[in-house]
Curated annotation (Swiss-Prot):
GO biological process: DNA recombination; DNA repair
NCBIfam families: ruvC
Gene: ruvC
The enzyme's E.C. designation: 3.1.21.10
UniProt keyword annotations, A-Z: Cytoplasm, DNA damage, DNA recombination, DNA repair, DNA-binding, Endonuclease, Hydrolase, Magnesium, Metal-binding, Nuclease
Protein name per its UniProtKB record: Crossover junction endodeoxyribonuclease RuvC
Organism of origin: Alcanivorax borkumensis (strain ATCC 700651 / DSM 11573 / NCIMB 13689 / SK2)
Similarity comment text for this entry: Belongs to the RuvC family.
Amino acid sequence: MALILGIDPGSRRTGYGVVDVVGNRSRAVAFGTITTSHKEIPPRLGEIFAGIDQVVKEYGPAEVSIEKVFMARNADSALKLGQARGAAIAAVMQACVPVFEYSARQVKQAVVGKGGAEKNQVGEMVKYLLKLDQRPQEDAADALAIALCHAHMRLSLARMAGATSVRRGRVR
């Protein structure tokens, strides 16, 4: 059993998703969105830090995966996204949990099978793969997809490295 926390950073809404992974099986443990309430960026960053810190303390993930910053058309938006991402990573690193980064294209490829997939396709696949009753809110679905991407990469890397216990449902 390994808990993986996926984070979809955003300056207004940061999605999180905790996935329990045993071998090639995954199940959603918790997911949601940290919605910031302030107009100014410094208090929003504090809310993101506190929210992710609370999730890390509550679930104790073994590993964390987070989406890489993409180059936005608007430099100010990219800067705010980078700051939100930094606040989330700082909260995780405070607990000494390893962080892995994936591009949006890598996440879509791992979950949907094509890197150019639409948001609704990602949400539907997350619902299907984790056997959820309904599609999660967009930011939470993205966070769960990021966690699933890491679970797939982790399993693939273990197989390539010749991990012996992958065959028994555990990666060691």
